Amino acid sequence: MKMLDLYGYTSIAQSFDKICISIASPESIRAMSYGEIKDISTTNYRTFKVEKGGLFCPKIFGPVNDDECLCGKYRKKRYRGVICEKCGVEVTSSKVRRERMGHIELVSPVAHVWFLKSLPSRIGALLDMPLKLIESILYSGDFVVIDPIATPLSKGEVISESAYNQAKDNYGEDSFIALTGAEAIRELLVRLDLHAINANLRSELESTTSEMKRKKIVKRLRIVENFINSGNKPEWMILTVIPILPPDLRPLVSLENGRPAVSDLNHHYRTIINRNNRLGKLLKLNPPAIMIRNEKRMLQEAVDALFDSTRRSYVSNKAGSVGYKKSLSDMLKGKQGRFRQNLLGKRVDYSGRSVIVVGPNLKLHQCGLPKKMALELFKPFICSKLKMYGIVPTVKLANKMIQNEKPEVWDILDEVIHEHPILLNRAPTLHRLGIQAFDPVLIEGKAIQLHPLVCSAFNADFDGDQMAVHIPLSLEAQLEARILMMSTNNILSPSNGKPIIVPSKDIILGIYYLTLQDYVEPEEILFFGDFSHVEYALHNKDIHICSKIKYKMNYCTDSSDGSGPTYYSKIVETTPGRLMLWQIFPEHKNLTFDLVNQVLTVKEITAIVDLVYRSCGQSETVEFSDKLMSLGFRYASQSGISFGRMDMIIPDTKTMHVDNASEKIKEFAVQYQDGLITKSERYNKVIDEWSKCTDLIAKDMMKAISVYDEESKLNSIYMMAHSGARGSASQMKQLAGMRGLMAKPSGEIIETPIISNFREGLNVFEYFNSTHGARKGLADTALKTANSGYLTRRLVDVAQDCIVVEYDCKTHNGFAMRSVIDGGTVVETLDNIILGRVAAVDIYNPITEELLVNAGELIDEAKVEKIRIAGLDAVKVRSPLTCEAKKGICALCYGRDLAIGDVVSIGEAVGVIAAQSVGEPGTQLTMRTFHVGGTAMRGVETSNLIAMLDAKVKLVNSNVVEDKYGNKIVMSRSCDVVLLDSVGNEKMRHSVPYGARLYVNDGQLVKITEKIADWDPYTMPIITEKTGIIKYMDLIDGVSINEVLDESTGISNRVVVDWKLHLQGANLRPRLVLVNDNGDIITLSSGLEANYFIPIGAVLSVQDGQKVHAGDVITRIPRESIKTRDITGGLPRVIELFEARRPKEHAIVSDIDGYVEFGKDYYRSKRRIFIKPVDDKLSPVEYLVPKGKHTIVNEGDFVHKGDLLMDGDPDPHDILRVLGVEALANYMIAEIQQVYRLQGVRIDNKHIEVILRQMLQKVEIFEPGDTMYLIGENVDVEEVLKTNSNMEKIGKSPAKYIPILQGITRASLDTNSFVSAASFQETTKVLTEAAFSGKEDSLYGLKENVIVGRLIPAGTGFLMNKIKKLSLLNKDDYSMYYNSEYQDLASIEAGHACSVSPSQGVSDTSGAVDY
């Protein structure tokens, strides 16, 4: 401990290792108490002194004033410890009034409401009685038989009062024992033999076959075992003594008008004392039983109200109603409760807040701090300096001097703030970049000045935003602020590793303007050899910034023979503006003039900043960014780019496009009238046509607007949008093209578009149509912000204890990563996915067999390039999901820390970073919904497949038939078209839907833009495989099929309806059968009969008895109308995935490989599908599909394990059960990333993997072996592995288990730390569970340590924790400990400690760590 004393580390918070919780026994309550309270008096109404013996009694709770007894006989510190003989008060510090407890001795026992009513009722479970019965005993005066003695009554039988009286008359007064109220329950609990119950339940569990009964037994068994293991006694759940909180925690505060404001708890205690005293007096008087019962019930209700008012049975006095008094439970739970209000979030002193304004003259590490604020915030520092320099003798005079703002004060303030970083924070703090450190620069005025480049990290703008300032006081805090939190040390975003300190808005515009080049060729191109000559020519206006010039550029390369650098020069054609920009670039071989010699938009500028950071390091990047900013601002103002009405050029072709679209829509209406297409098909075609028309107009507008004009040069609005400074193509489309289609709040698209644009102005009808989107945007913003904030909170809670605990867990497991292909195009390359990960196995070039990356080596940019050249399409890398580290993860499985670009440091809280990275964009995006103003963002449905490159076609699972026109029709439901390059590597894969027309053969070579296949995107067809005659089976008019007349067209369609609603429809199986000329059913190539089952809502395309050809469509299933998908649709999807909810219309997944067979229907509602395995020895697996749901497999189809059998999203739990963890991870990552990708947000996969790891912490036992686990029990993975290894050591059989997926809320509540779970949600439930189980909290996570007031075990605190643990061990234990769990201390000491890497300007980190 001496070692810790150096750091002042032996405070109460540090002096314990874990927290235990259990039920308090009456003895322990009395032991904690300093005296019994029998009186309800509080203070004397005249003297306002506290009354002796009352709820604030100084004799019991301690003196009201420091070192002063109540009567005033003893006053002063010297009498400390003396007990006044007159008033009986101990002379001590008044602080004890926050610690000393009292108690009430109850005349009659009462049940503790938490154990009674918190479901499942613990008292009910132990006694095996329903809650209703127990309540009737406690509140309604029913009796329970304790001991039947010689009567036919049974033990535990509940009888009413009249039955009790009757039994007494029949059997005699003493022939049996029956009691009522809490005494009865207590007596039953005392008589319980838990060990016997445990043995009985276990034997019952083995013999039972009913699943429901098994679940019930398991529930009860768990509660019984928890009681046995924890050492709690069941009768402690019935209270005979009630503790009273120390008085300073329930104070009496006098208001301005002199009336006292009483804490609600005092009201509860008074009621209890009153009723208890009254009951005591009553019992002495021997009154009628009904009076006693009533008084006992009132006492029970008073105690219930004290512990938890919300669980009371009667409705009045519920939370929120007038006169509601807060109970102890209310003080713990919710946002205003003790945990979240006072323990996890506290108000901070030495802080201030003010409006922010832009500070374009600041350096990146600086912020402008108003002098007035600085003076107040740094007051103690100034006082001490004034005293130290002898300017003032006392602190009081120093304060006066500061108040008068004497000149000396300002000089000292300058000295005090020199190199003293301050923290700036902008709410909402959605990720760690919401708080950053800066060096303050004193400024006049009252607003804080902020550097423009950090705005994107803070998500700040200057329209009235406010920011808070905090001062790190201690030297350690200042050191951490400078090294870890300084804005210059946070250049990269922790969520995707791309720079976040990048120019935006005006800066981009200035740089874009600077790199533009005149389109008009000058009469003669001037030639320059030196930049000073260019500046001279610019000054004399001989040339313009954008003029074309020739310049002699000097280059330097490394010579091939290694003799040193070679210099050469080259003439380049460029502009003065680009040369100006080139001057600020740092020198490095990776930074060539070609980077600048082009028109730079936001994309290129971001890439340049990234390249500068990767090539030249941090300090160069910071300098470069600052120079880039000032250059950008300067030329944005010089360029004179403005926003003019005439810049919005409406294309001449607009009317033509609109007319064409209108004509087509009339055509669709005619087709619909003639019954060629259905209503939904017409709607979908109309929507598509208008989308196409809007896109064409937008394209023409962009063409017109981007034309270089002799007079006005380039169009200003085009420059703003094209550079990426402000606005987007979709906003410009609305300004000068046409507004397009609008969405209703429900998400449906209104089929009449807004043809006008904002320049022309909208008519009344169009304006009214626009209001939908605008209002939806505002309502969404309010609702979704709350939703997204709650998602972030749950994510942080589930991942908070995921910390990097060691360097390498030595695992060889990992996942194969592939590039992400969506709709045939590569949306995420393999390079991006594997960058910054660690290889799980050696990676070789498949052709040359050269070793590219060793197993366990970080894949950096250079290695990614090697892998890309080698043409690998999959790489196995380590993942947080497969990490084998205990109580956290290892650095190598995590890979690169995206914020510093190097392997993650030990002690990094990667869980919280992951949660912030996933949660932060959710909030951002929801806030961004209304910017487009509700116009429908939706592409045209893809209906064909075009080759994107010259390639060779490979068809996978292609079962095709030829129709009467000679077209090849795809009959397989899992047909893929793969395009291979000349080497045979897969370049593109696209699934082709059932019913598509295929234009290529297997092995055929295709040219770029050649059509491969097409299909109808609006309907799902059912197609015949052979030629024959159609016969209706079970398609009965009015029962399973209806003629639906379309009123607008007068045409009727035959639609299949829900036949289950009819009595005679019970056993129908509506289908179309294909027969030959003799009427025999045709056999298909699979060997099965040609039966085509028809789902509800399908439209029949053939008549009974009609002849059909192979490849004909016999039924069409219309797809539902298309809805727009933005993050408002996307955020609930992300929540659904993280909560691991079963999708509403979830698909059924095949558990095995095999052939599909349709069985006999199950009652009215379900269809039976069998999957017959390939191996005949195995029995088929049965699935029940709701009738009328469209199955996407046909009889005889071969399905693989994990294939879907019907429409819908698969259930993640099914994927885990059938295909395992890797398939689940791939599915979840793909689905979550798809939502974010739609919004253009990049999140690294590893963040999602970290959250998934936390969701997969539990396993389900299906065979307990010789362990004490129960079947179906959910246990922690680490705990099972530990138990199993112990079992194997003693030669017993271990438990068998399967991994289970928990939603983030469930996982947070099931965590090993009850302190963390209680502070998250369902506080009373968690604490009840923890108390009767006698849980221990070892304080491993971050939250638990914040709550008990310690340094968190992450970052710098991680090392302090290790030192603390090592300092508590003796020499022998130390070496064992060091060798086993802490072999990584050496690697920590070598510089892996607190996220500091040498590139961050700290030359030697070992000195910072080697204590």
Swiss-Prot record:
SMART domains: RPOLA_N. Zn(2+) 2 binds at C809, C883, C890, C893. Its EC number is 2.7.7.6. Mg(2+) binds at D461, D463, D465. It catalyses: RNA(n) + a ribonucleoside 5'-triphosphate = RNA(n+1) + diphosphate. Keywords: DNA-directed RNA polymerase, Magnesium, Metal-binding, Nucleotidyltransferase, Transcription, Transferase, Zinc. One of its GO terms (cellular component) is DNA-directed RNA polymerase complex. InterPro entries: DNA-dir_RpoC_beta_prime (IPR045867), DNA-dir_RpoC_beta_prime_bact (IPR012754), RNA_pol_asu (IPR000722), RNA_pol_N (IPR006592), RNA_pol_Rpb1_1 (IPR007080), RNA_pol_Rpb1_3 (IPR007066), RNA_pol_Rpb1_3_sf (IPR042102), RNA_pol_Rpb1_4 (IPR007083). CDD domains: RNAP_beta'_C (cd02655), RNAP_beta'_N (cd01609). Disulfide bonds: none annotated. It is an enzyme of class 2 (transferase). GO terms for molecular function: DNA binding; DNA-directed RNA polymerase activity; magnesium ion binding; zinc ion binding. It comes from the Bacteria. Zn(2+) 1 binds at C69, C71, C84, C87. Its cofactor is Mg(2+); Zn(2+). GO terms for biological process: DNA-templated transcription. Binds 1 Mg(2+) ion per subunit. Binds 2 Zn(2+) ions per subunit. HAMAP family: RNApol_bact_RpoC. DNA-dependent RNA polymerase catalyzes the transcription of DNA into RNA using the four ribonucleoside triphosphates as substrates. The RNAP catalytic core consists of 2 alpha, 1 beta, 1 beta' and 1 omega subunit. When a sigma factor is associated with the core the holoenzyme is formed, which can initiate transcription. Belongs to the RNA polymerase beta' chain family. NCBIfam families: rpoC_TIGR. This is DNA-directed RNA polymerase subunit beta'. It comes from Ehrlichia ruminantium (strain Gardel). The gene is rpoC.
